[in-house]
From Swiss-Prot:
Cell compartments where the protein resides: Cytoplasm; Cytoplasm, Cytoskeleton; Cytoplasm, Cytoskeleton, Cilium basal body
Name recorded for this polypeptide: Protein fuzzy homolog
Record keyword Protein transport present: yes
Subunit structure, interactors included: Interacts with rsg1. Interacts with intu and wdpcp; fuz, intu and wdpcp probably form the core CPLANE (ciliogenesis and planar polarity effectors) complex.
UniProt organism field: Xenopus tropicalis (Western clawed frog)
Family, similarity comment: Belongs to the fuzzy family.
């Protein structure tokens, strides 16, 4: 495989017929013989009652996943940051994206392969967005990417009133695919459903309004809901999940102007914090290059690799490009969650087996971890409510990283609650 390339394959599990293939970083398509070999080894293992999930070669990692004994997804990646965790999350996201757009019934009960292939084309833009580097982390964390905007109380009140007038309880205001404010019922959807809805809206071509049928993978995988979206200003959309009523025209002509025109300036201000994810007034240590903050209760996150955008605009010799920062922070998150901060279910059991052998011998788990390289330092901290991952300049003293992390947590719990 070419360096930094990814291939995603979707096949009908029973027949092995390819339904689609998507790729990143390569102009070549996989040959039928390669596709057949990848699917064949998985089917052979399954027939021997062996669950084949992943393998790796010198420069490539492969992962398999079967869903409902109907759809098989295979991903091959030669990216340096590819891991078992990231590839499994990718396969989960891809299947749930398919459910979101065409529903579970057509995927579980495949009656016409050619028609299914045609229907799945509607998923391509959303699926492709999971293969690309973005300014979001929800695909990996399974949390909702958010921004802390100015005038949040005003926007929240406006959204609540607008959603109620649209005969719904599920409403959301997003900037660049990140949630600014949402109604209480919107937050009751699963975090993966909210993440998928945000990524769907961000992946679609800009439009003043849309009436889009969606299936909620966990809440309503077989019965569609209507997703109404309206572009308030370029880059800022308001979304409503509803039933047969009201009509798109009624909401667009009667409600949008009534509720959102008076708050035009606060809406535009959302764009100023979109890249950093929070206002410039949030105090951050000058050594921080990027951060990922996760609220464990709400399953929402703040993410940026432009912690000091105004300062960096004046520099032309950045030691780490934004793409390198994203890759470093994603890799550190994967390392920490796989080895030191395993996710926990409500019953207290780990959802991810720890890859570090010493974990199984102790009753406690790590609450802090760090890595050091020639180009950057990374620090992770786990508290009762939050997970924090920092990307720091290499010249930041190692002994000061804990203090920097504590001050960062304090800033987002006291001055700017998240």
């Amino acid at each position: 495989m070419e360096d930094s390339s990814v291939f995603l394959l979707c096949l009908a599990a029973s027949s092995g017929v390819p339904l689609y293939s998507r790729s990143k970083g390569s102009s070549r398509q996989l040959t039928f013989s390669v596709i057949g070999s990848l699917n064949g080894v998985h089917m052979f293992a399954s027939n021997q009652d062996v669950l084949l999930t992943s393998t790796c070669t010198e420069n490539t990692r492969v992962a398999w996943r079967a869903f409902h004994d109907s759809i098989t997804l295979i991903v091959m990646s030669s990216e340096s940051g590819a891991s078992k965790l990231s590839l499994n999350r990718l396969l989960e996201n891809v299947f749930n994206a398919m459910v979101l757009v065409i529903g579970l019934d057509d995927l579980v009960n495949i009656k016409n392969v050619e028609r299914l292939k045609k229907d799945l084309r509607a998923c391509y833009r959303l699926i492709d967005s999971f293969l690309l580097e973005t300014e979001k982390m929800g695909d990996l964390t399974q949390c909702v990417d958010c921004v802390i905007a100015y005038d949040v109380p005003i926007l929240q009140e406006c959204l609540d009133n607008f959603t109620q007038a649209a005969e719904s309880n599920f409403g959301c205001l997003m900037a660049g695919g990140k949630v600014v404010v949402a109604t209480e019922k919107w937050w009751r959807l699963s975090s993966q459903e909210v993440m998928l809805l945000c990524w769907l809206v961000a992946s679609l071509a800009p439009h003043s309004s849309r009436d889009y049928p969606v299936y909620l993978p966990q809440g309503s995988p077989t019965v569609p809901h209507r997703l109404l979206t309206f572009q308030l200003v370029p880059g800022v959309d308001v979304c409503v999940l509803c039933g047969p009523k009201p009509s798109l025209q009624k909401v667009e002509t009667e409600l949008i102007e009534r509720f959102w025109k008076p708050v035009h300036d606060p809406i535009k201000s959302c764009l100023r914090v979109q890249m950093r994810s929070f206002p410039a007034s949030v105090p951050l240590h000058h050594g921080i290059l990027g951060l990922l903050l996760i609220n464990r209760d709400m399953n929402k996150s703040l993410y940026t690799v432009q912690a000091h955008p105004m300062e960096e605009m004046q520099k032309t010799d950045l030691k780490l490009t934004l793409e390198q920062r994203r890759s470093a922070l994603r890799s550190f998150y994967t390392l920490a969650m796989s080895r030191y901060f395993p996710s926990e279910r409500a019953d207290g059991k780990n959802t991810l087996p720890s890859e570090e052998s010493f974990q199984s011998g102790f009753s406690h788990s790590a609450h802090q971890c760090y890595t050091i390289s020639s180009s950057c330092k990374c620090y992770g901290m786990k508290t009762e409510l939050h997970l924090l991952f920092l990307l720091l300049k290499p010249e930041v003293p190692t002994f000061s990283m804990r203090s920097i992390a504590n001050k960062t947590i304090a800033a987002f719990t006291k001055d700017f609650p998240f």
